[in-house]
Design a protein with these regions (language model features):
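Helix-breaking motifs and short loop linkers at transmembrane-helix boundaries and internal kinks
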Residues: 38, 70, 91-97, 235, ...
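C-terminal transmembrane helical hairpin of 12-TM major facilitator-type secondary transporters
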Residues: 269-313
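Cytoplasmic helix-loop-helix junction between adjacent transmembrane helices
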Residues: 101-139
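Helix-to-loop junctions at the C-terminal end of transmembrane segments
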Residues: 59-70, 255-267, 351
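Helix-loop-helix hairpin linking two adjacent transmembrane segments in secondary transporters
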Residues: 97, 126-182, 225, 229
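Conserved MFS/SLC helix-loop-helix module at the cytosolic interface between two early adjacent transmembrane helices
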Residues: 57-93
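Extracytoplasmic
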Residues: 8-41, 59-62, 222-227
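Paired small-residue
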Residues: 85, 96-105, 293-301
Length: 389
């Protein structure tokens, strides 16, 4: 029984990796894709931005719509849509078709990811749920960070089409594994759409949404410009920058493992302490950003904190709305994407007005606001629980 549950969580982790790999893997391929389709750099950027926008829009809607359907069937549907999109991307010579082949699967992205978090949490006891979810988050981190260099390596060694084959192969393998090894998972207690939407009446839900947006803004507002920061402030070479990004990605995975333990044993203390610890890292980065060795150490610590932060955000959202886990995870994914967009926008403003070094300010500002949101969220969450007794 334990082995079957471990296999289920493993399949979910690889499934999330495949989906995030499809989303993020093209980042390193954009110049090659622009050349292949004979479009400008700004136009090819739509392959990334349109995907993120589709995820943000569908996050609160699609998981809700599919919440009453057998979860195995939903997983197979989503994986099938991604495989189809991957296959179209391999063979199309039309950029518009390639764009559609990404946007349509992107709409289903929150469905699979929210299901993966929900099913992983439900496969163990309530106390062990954060640990199971943290394992799925390893797939998120790997897809976001490791997928990019792997796809770039394949494209450089073989061709652009072969990197697309890599995306498809991962999703096909997960589809087959889901078909063969994941048991049927009918929804036993189906919640009405109204019952799930009613969680939006709770102040703690909205404060959790705000917290997730601000936390992701604090992390990705700086990380979005990390390569530029290392190039212009630290004066690193492109090869060294690639190494630093790998360090960050590996540290992210370590952060997921750490989160699984801390969120079980000391969730509230960890959440309240997080803005101070990350804030200290950013302050040190601001004053030592010109030095390569301190930046390498900072990158390692920052990556671990970022990995923990993703798990923490998901925990904050789902613990506020335990009665509607699928909808809560959809809200988490939307809030997280909005946080990335907000942080990157404000970070770009600081860079344009003050210089690359000052992108740290978007992180610090977001952390101050997120700390206030966390305190309010925890107060409302505690108040709501005491009144419901």
């Amino acid at each position: 029984m334990v082995n079957q549950k471990n296999l289920l969580v493993f399949i979910l982790t690889i499934g999330v990796f495949g989906i995030l790999n499809t989303e993020m893997g093209v980042i390193g391929l954009l110049p090659s894709i622009a050349e292949h389709f004979h479009v400008s750099a700004s136009t090819v950027g739509w392959l990334v931005s349109s995907f993120a926008l589709a995820v943000a829009v569908s996050g609160p809607i699609f998981p809700l719509l599919f919440s009453g359907i057998n979860r195995k069937k939903v997983m197979l549907l989503v994986l099938g849509v991604f495989v189809l999109g991957n296959v179209v991307s391999i063979f199309t010579t039309n950029f518009t078709i390639a764009l559609v082949a990404r946007v349509v699967p992107a709409l289903f992205h929150p469905v699979y990811c929210s299901l993966a978090f929900t099913v992983a949490a439900a496969s163990v006891s309530q106390e062990e749920a954060p640990k199971a979810v943290s394992k799925v988050f390893i797939g998120v981190s790997a897809g976001m960070v490791i997928g990019v260099p792997i796809a770039s390596l394949i494209a450089g060694a073989a061709s652009l089409q072969m990197s697309m084959v890599f995306f498809a192969a991962v999703n096909i393998m997960v589809f087959i594994a889901t078909l063969l090894f994941v048991p049927s998972m009918p929804v036993e207690e189906r919640l009405s759409y109204g019952a799930q939407l009613s969680v939006l009446k709770k102040p703690a839900t909205w404060l959790s949404i705000v917290t997730v947006i601000l936390m992701n803004s604090a992390i990705f507002g700086v990380y979005s410009y990390f390569a530029e920061y290392l190039k212009t402030v630290t004066n690193m070479s492109s090869n060294t920058i690639s190494l630093m990004l790998f360090i960050y990605g590996g540290a992210n995975i370590i952060g997921n493992v750490v989160a699984g333990k801390l969120l079980i044993n000391s969730a509230i203390k960890s959440v309240v302490s997080f803005p101070f610890v990350l804030g200290a890292v950013y302050i040190i980065m601001f004053f030592t950003g010109q030095l390569s060795v301190p930046m390498a150490i900072i990158t390692l610590i920052w990556g671990i904190l970022a990995g923990f932060g993703g798990n923490m955000n998901q925990y904050l959202m789902t613990s506020s709305t335990p009665e509607a886990p699928d909808f809560a995870n959809g809200l988490f994914l939307t809030s997280a994407n909005l946080g990335v967009t907000f942080g990157a926008t404000v970070g770009g403003f600081f860079i344009a007005e003050m210089g690359t070094q000052y992108v740290i300010f978007v992180g610090l500002l977001s952390l101050v606001l997120s700390f206030v949101a966390i305190l309010l969220r925890n107060y409302m969450f505690t108040l709501t629980r005491s009144l419901s007794r």
